[in-house]
Regions:
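A short beta-loop-alpha structural element at the N-terminal edge
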Residues: 4-19
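Conserved GNAT-fold acetyl-CoA-binding loop/helix
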Residues: 25-44
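A short helix-loop-beta-strand connector motif used in the catalytic cores of GNAT acetyltransferases and
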Residues: 44-57, 74-77
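Conserved beta-hairpin
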Residues: 53-68
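Conserved acyl-donor/pantetheine-binding loop and adjacent beta-alpha core of acyl/acetyltransferases
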Residues: 69-104
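Conserved acetyl-CoA-binding loop-helix of GNAT-fold acetyltransferases
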Residues: 101-118, 136-140
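Conserved GNAT acetyl-CoA-binding A-motif
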Residues: 119-130
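Conserved active-site alpha-helix within GNAT-family acetyltransferase domains
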Residues: 130-147, 155
């Protein structure tokens, strides 16, 4: 199988939005009923990722099977963390957002994490409390739970970090 990760292009948008809808179905079927409500992530959000050179697609045999945003610090919602602390609060970091894939696309998360750590050694990710699939994947990939952050909307997220040695 030929899998590549590359920067997303505007022409990928229809495929990216299909991946997002598939990811929402996975969330709902696993009991995560509240993360990624109607209209999120929107095409405008994905376009913003692309404009920051931070939108990436994962392709298998030329088919877009996944998407994620990989953006440099600072992440405004990460300035304050509750009930814990970041592993390191001095070093620059990258944040990963909007991770999505088709259910039949295997090893997407580990491939994405390998890609991210090839570009930075300090990665932060947050997820919804109900997103047990993501929490499991983060722990499996060596991320440490650091505490709680709040989005600009006021919604709570569980915050994780991993620093490569």
């Amino acid at each position: 199988m030929s899998r590549i990760i590359r920067e997303a292009k505007q022409t990928d948008m229809p495929d990216i939005m299909k991946v997002m809808e598939a990811a929402k179905k996975i969330m709902r079927s696993s009991g995560n009923m509240h993360q990624w409500g109607e209209g999120y992530p929107s095409e405008a959000v994905i376009t913003s990722d692309m404009e920051k050179n931070g939108g990436f697609v994962i392709e298998d045999e030329g088919r877009v099977v996944g998407y994620f945003a990989f953006l440099p610090s600072p992440e405004p919602t990460y300035h304050k963390i509750y009930d814990g602390k970041w592993l390191d609060d001095e070093l620059p970091y990258h944040v990963v957002h909007r991770i999505a894939s088709y259910p039949d696309a295997h090893h997407i998360f580990s491939d994405m994490i390998d890609f991210c750590f090839a570009h930075d050694t300090n990665i932060r990710i947050d997820t919804h409390r109900d997103n047990t699939i993501m929490q499991h994947n983060l722990q499996k990939q060596g991320f440490t739970y650091c505490g709680i952050i709040y989005l600009a909307s006021g919604d709570e997220r569980l915050a994780y970090q991993r620093i490569a040695k």
